[in-house]
A protein has these predicted regions:
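Non-catalytic substrate-recognition/targeting regions of SAM-dependent transferases
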Residues: 10-24, 31-106, 113-116
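Single, functionally critical "micro-switch" positions that shape active/binding sites
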Residues: 26-27, 134
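Conserved SAM/SAH cofactor-binding pocket of Class I
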Residues: 118-163
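N-terminal accessory targeting/assembly segments
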Residues: 1-6
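Short, flexible loop segments at the rims of nucleotide/cofactor-binding pockets, characterized by
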Residues: 8-10, 131
């Protein structure tokens, strides 16, 4: 039997991956985007991927990193998803970027839980946690710390976020 340590995240699902792409659900919307680490064959057919995806990232022929999103009608380019853990209730804004990102990194959920749980423990011990989140990017870890009552400082300087 194969076990994973992935936290419960009802607003996220990895539907399929392979052939250097991944098909993911964030809330009610399914996105198709490049994934260089998905070196295996996908399970679902190309037709199923096309039919399922509400948004698909198309790479710019002149750039390995940039591209555009093709959206089905009625698919927004921004929406929110929720994430809950042990009293932490996060609402995070999804946003489709020109460099294939969507606004969060769901694989970081275990880290959000760790940060939240440790900040809650520190507060229970009478200490005020102080969190300096460098390279903070989308902010999931900062939100988790703040939700637990930590004093937080969120810093990032990735060019696409600053400009």
């Amino acid at each position: 039997m194969f076990e994973t340590l992935i936290p419960r995240f009802p607003d996220y699902e990895l539907i399929d991956s392979g052939d250097f792409e991944k098909l993911e659900r964030f809330g009610r919307y399914v996105v198709r985007r490049p994934e260089p680490q998905a070196i295996w064959r996908r399970t679902l057919s190309e037709e199923e991927w096309r039919r399922t995806a509400d948004a698909a990232f198309l790479r710019d022929a002149r750039s390995d990193e940039r591209g555009v999103w093709r959206l089905k009608p009625q698919t927004p380019d921004r929406w929110t998803v929720g994430y809950d853990h042990a009293g932490m209730h996060l609402r995070m804004r999804m946003g489709l970027t020109s460099f294939k990102h969507v606004g969060i990194f769901p694989e970081q959920a275990a880290n959000w839980n760790f940060i939240y749980d440790n900040c809650v423990r520190m507060r229970a011990e009478g200490r005020t946690p102080k969190v300096l989140n460098l390279f903070a990017y989308t902010g999931g870890a900062t939100l988790a710390a703040r939700a637990a009552g930590a004093d937080t400082t969120h810093v990032d300087s990735v060019k696409q976020v600053v400009t």
